[in-house]
Amino acid sequence: MAVAYADKPNHFINFPLTQFQGFVLNYKGLQFQLLDEGVDCKIQTAPHISLAMLDIQPEDYRSVDVAIQEVIDDMHWGEGFQIKFENPHILGRCIVLDVKGVEELHDDLVNYIRDKGCVADQSRKWIGHCTIAQLTDAALSIKENVDFINSMQFNYKITINPSSPARLEIVKLGAEKKDGFYETIASHWMGIRFEYNPPTDKLAMIMGYCCSEVVRKELEEGDLPENDDDAWFKLSYHYENNSWFFRHVYRKSSYFRKSCQNLDCNCLGFYESSVEED
């Protein structure tokens, strides 16, 4: 079966960098050097890594959103991983940094998104990079500018672990920027699954069948099957695997949160005030 490519992309998977203050301080230092040298360019105000280009429609957002969360769930953190930024150079009309350390994350995102039936990645080889600025045509033709850019030095590492402020986002091409970030369609903290550890090995130990109706009322329409047996299986299966659906239910259902936290349910005597947040 032929692979469809996002050679005319309209969205991308974004890894924002503005929240990494040490990196941004050094990144802005590079931009200041360019401006101080008089290089005619447009400075990038939202530093980021484009991890995958997408050709999707609004009806695909949910599928891509789920794929991102599944990638996060299946990550094997160990002691984390490092992202390395180095070698300022010209790529097309842009001044960029080489980015190393996210190749596996790129591959996982592309594979998981394609598994959902959505179009991801381009036919040309993906090159990890971080854009510093975009040159004007006039600036690109000046040899002194090119020589100066090639002489610039940069070497910085960011360690990513479950407590890092790392995020994966769906962004539409041309999206507005504010305070160093793109306007997003969806944004997920990469360490989010470590917030919610299952309190027991079996959901059945703390909840009963009648809980499914209470939980269903607090979720989005269609999240849980109408059949109670099917709904229970979906809750139990995903709960045991601590995957994206558990996190979704945990966030959306205050009753589910209280039951998990208390290792007990109160569905027969359920009333709204019994699940108020502390």
From Swiss-Prot:
It comes from the Viruses. Gene3D superfamilies: Cyclic phosphodiesterase (3.90.1140.10). It holds the Pfam family Corona_NS2A. Transmembrane segments: none annotated. Belongs to the coronaviruses ns2a protein family. This is Non-structural protein 2a. It comes from Bovine coronavirus (strain LSU-94LSS-051) (BCoV-LSU).
